[in-house]
Amino acid sequence: MTDTADHEHVLIVDFGSQVTQLIARRLRESGVYCEIHPYDKVDAVLDSFRPKAVILSGGPASVHEAESPAASKRLFELDVPVLGICYGEQTMCDVLGGKVEPGTTREFGRAEIEIVRESPLLDGLGGAGHFEPVWMSHGDKVTALPMGFETVAVSEGSPFAVIADEGRRFYGIQFHPEVAHTPRGALILRNFTHKIAGLKGDWTMKAFREEAIARIRDQVGDGRIICGLSGGVDSSVAAVLIHEAIGDQLTCVFVDHGLLRLNEAEQVVTMFRDHYNIPLVHVDAAEEFLGALAGVTDPETKRKTIGRLFVEVFDREAAKIEGAAFLAQGTLYPDVIESVSARGGPSAVIKSHHNVGGLPDYMKLKLVEPLRELFKDEVRALGVELGLPPQFVGRHPFPGPGLAIRIPGEVTPERVAILQKADAIYLDEIRKAGLYDSIWQAFAVLLPVRTVGVMGDARTYDEVCALRAVTSTDGMTADFFEFPWEVLSRAATRIINEVRGINRVVYDVTSKPPGTIEWE
């Protein structure tokens, strides 16, 4: 729980939907601070968190299942507006005395609702008789409304697609306004928070910056703090924010594992030492990391080897910093949400997480996580607010294990150098074409596959380079980017001509799912 007493805020009750985070992102985009908490922790949350409005998320359960999650009755006794989305509408109706039954037909995917009555929830969409495209995902449906509710909109499969008790300001919608497939869903959510709940939308990065600085000073006092710097956006923004708060009480430790992009280590050192004058310990551990990776070809073993060694090197260097009492990490809000998710339960490990979980317990450092309230796009906005170069905060995501997971097979110094050059050429051509900011992530992969080629009159037998570029909003799903062919042609020609060791270039047109964005 964060200190947000100076902000109007919304409580989002999570019933296990895969897209609950999108509700929070839409609200934050409209300047409304919100927090997500699991349905079974709500009563405890309400003892300290005083929401101005409540949103009940969707979820995979049926209200007819034994021990199905139910909305706490306390939520309807707060005298604040409540919006139930999909399962949230169903559990609200069930708790308030309505009726929910299994649907004879299910609604999944694109659908249309017909507005039959005006409501401030749907202001700006159209009056009675207007049809609005939405995204449905439900099997059960409400068949009888609780007392005080009226129908606002219907759909082919749901007679109560939108319902409202205007007196108590309780609303239910059977579709998902938070997803991009509901084109004007953000407007519906804004109507709820701004028009119905009367919120001003005062959540800005300028306000967050001022409050975060005050919190850091209060937490750290005159203590010393260590920040692990990876060169990525999250740790860099955290470091600059902390330095603004406490100055040279901060020391950054930059462990260079030799697996960064071309010239990236030098850029990080220059920016933090010369531009921001932040005390920085630069550890060139490339030889140590590459030595540990010799002979390793399994992707998960690579990740674990890099993670283990990173902790060892960081531990070794941090121990040299006298009087350190705090450790700063760039934890983001999605990490916090997942740790207390209503979904819970075991899940398959697709890939171990990029980030290191912290230092060994014996170091007794207290954790400082100044970004734990923020989503990735908010971190970028905060970086701009703090004066970080836009080209830096706008960089594409880069994995913690670095180029090691973009080199299938054994990672050697020679293969790293080849990939660094190919990747730099690829990104250079993307920037020249003005496409960099239209792409979520772009990178080159060096494959452990050799092919025959011809250079001049000579035969070559070199490795293949795969180029990858995807569009996405959150990294959970992704589509391959449809380049103009001349951009790919220029990149491929330059790579083959300028990078010794590559004689063939291919483009990856796999979406996620079924593939992942990274190759390993």
Curated annotation (Swiss-Prot):
Disulfide bonds: none annotated. Residues 9-202 form the Glutamine amidotransferase type-1 domain. Signal peptide: none annotated. It holds the Pfam family NAD_synthase. The keyword Nucleotide-binding applies. ATP binds at residues 230-236. Its EC number is 6.3.5.2. The active site is at residues 86, 176, 178. Pathway: Purine metabolism; GMP biosynthesis; GMP from XMP (L-Gln route): step 1/1. Residues 203-395 form the GMPS ATP-PPase domain. Catalyzes the synthesis of GMP from XMP. PANTHER family: GMP SYNTHASE [GLUTAMINE-HYDROLYZING], GMP SYNTHASE-RELATED. This is GMP synthase [glutamine-hydrolyzing]. It comes from Phenylobacterium zucineum (strain HLK1).
